């Protein structure tokens, strides 16, 4: 998620995940970059152990509770479906809220798209290039980080519909070399409950990436960084946001789809969904036109232009590129199951606890207080793409920085402030330890606040002058 004005920085992130005792998050220090593919909505990195492989009772999230008729004295009335009408007054309030977060967080630029049955909102704020001052624009391409996981998950579910794999099959039946693979199912990988150690928290991986952001990684090399560590927990016992899970699922897609993962996702997901501005890159090149992305995930912690950093390190967990309009369309397609059989989509929407009240995780998506979808973060960029089913409404936003603001991903702060106005009974949550920006401080775009934690990635990493985990 990104921040607001000032020299901006953008590193794609996904879900904002608070600390958990079982999997401590690395501390982000000035001079220490923390890279981590994060997932959508704010969610705890792990939930407490439970008995059995899927001890928690799944909750089907297709029909969130309806909103009350109104959300405040003197405010526009929310319709029964949960969103307020996009009146001129509401639009003005949205403009003001977005400008406020932009200014307070130091995010360079943001694109925001809202679609409701009663109207649309599509606006850009700030700049796409801090050097030239080129304005941000909805037509620009940005990296989407962990939004990629929703595409990978959909590709796996398409294979389920084709009868090539079952969600409760052991991953060892399809992908060799996964530690404990006989006891880890495809479903547990998609639901972030494999218990494996995440490669993006391995010190050697982080040091390699931070010191050479154009390094080309293979999927097997990525997984090897995680496989050398013992499991964090038994399969199926706790939620832990983990990029390794989605690299393994990418290998599954290649094995059963018979094509490179990016090609299969393009043919089976992007093209059928009619997403003409969405792509799975094979190198660091950005399609034109694009927004420059800024990050502090560098050896010194200084903000750098990460636009053309090679995303091979994130692969099927976070490498993709899109526009805000395509994300609006995709959020609805993903949440309604337009590309899947109804029974398969129903399995996808069964969410389990994450440890964060109001937030559950299903198969490659979150339910954040009724909003279904994902968020993403990668060095230089952040995104959110979510859908509120009973309101048939979509929210998508993209930022060109991933620099944290007082420990929080800027994208979550934007989504939180926007939904306070748009859907006051369904407010996109951020981790309890985080708060909406109030005044510019040490955690602004000029650099992370000392001691701020990286959201969205689990364990570890030492040394004061080394990043602890890469955010995605």
Regions found by a protein language model. Give the residues of each.
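Secretory targeting and sorting signals
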Residues: 1-51, 58-61, 65
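Catalytic loop of the DD-peptidase/beta-lactamase superfamily, centered on the K-T-G motif
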Residues: 46-123, 266-267, 307-472
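Active-site-proximal loop and beta-strand segments within enzyme catalytic domains
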Residues: 88, 116, 125, 129-241
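Hydrophobic/aromatic residues within well-ordered alpha-helical segments
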Residues: 90, 94, 148-151, 245, ...
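Active-site SXXK
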Residues: 98-99, 112, 118-120, 141-168, ...
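Alpha-solenoid HEAT/Armadillo repeat architecture
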Residues: 103, 176-179, 254
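Short, surface-exposed loop or secondary-structure junction motifs
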Residues: 122, 184-371, 375-379
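Active-site donor-binding loop signature of nucleotide-sugar glycosyltransferases
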Residues: 125-127, 296, 399
